Amino acid sequence: MGIVFDDRTPAIDQYSFPLCSELSGRELILVAPKKKYTLKFEDDTLLTFSESGTAGCRCLKLADQLYFVTIGQNSTVAVIDLKERLATLVMPDMGYAFCAIEQDWKALPETRHCETDELVGTGLRWNFGSEFYSKQVYFSVDRCRMTWSPENYRFDNFPARYTRIREKVYLVDINARVPAGSYVPRGYDRFFMLQDYDKLLFVGAAFSIDDAAPLMLSGFGETDDLDPTLFGDD
């Protein structure tokens, strides 16, 4: 197991989900409270974003009509829910935008994705491969404890943010250092994971401070016998 490049897309190869092309050719208008954004998917690997122009993109599908999209290489991502006509944009200079998706002749949905504390007090082991996993403890609304195999005895405390996407589906955003010896190359320091707690599956990406291509992530979760002291807010 290691890093594989498929059409110049780095990913952890063992449990890597295939890239999704279902958004190719579509143009989406995302409506935030004070602004509109446009995402035009030129093809499977290229889109035009109204905020930054044309950029490379990669798309992973987590569930029916639910997609995780990377935009360029600077920690810009979108979670697109076509079923509920909702979207979340994360942009390094502008933060989060919780949006509705325009559709001709239809009113905008009243609900939006939102920040949540529903994960607080929970923890799981997320498996990227048979020998590579991350244990994560969501002990407060803005912090998590994380460890990587093989050094799973050492938990570090990192800034985190949790967004509710659907019932039991969340976007987890962690600013984390990768320890030496991990399968993730050094330099990747921001991790997005779109997590389904019913199916215990996830998709996402890691972004690098060195402006390298996003590292696509996917796999499955499982419960783990975590030390109760890890859940304390100290």
Question: Where are each of the predicted segments found?
Answer:
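Surface-exposed beta-loop interaction hotspot
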Residues: 88-130
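Extracellular beta-propeller repeat domains
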Residues: 44, 55, 72-84, 92-95, ...
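Large eukaryotic, non-enzymatic subunits of multiprotein complexes that serve as scaffolds/tethers
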Residues: 1-13, 96-97
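N-terminal glycine/threonine-rich, aromatic-flanked beta-hairpin/loop signature
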Residues: 29-60, 130-163
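Contiguous, well-ordered beta-strand patches that form the walls/edges
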Residues: 51-80, 151-199
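N-terminal helix-cap/turn-to-beta initiation motif at the start of protein domains
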Residues: 12-27, 109-123
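Helix-rich interaction surfaces within compact, conserved domain-sized segments
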Residues: 85-105, 199-200, 204-216, 220
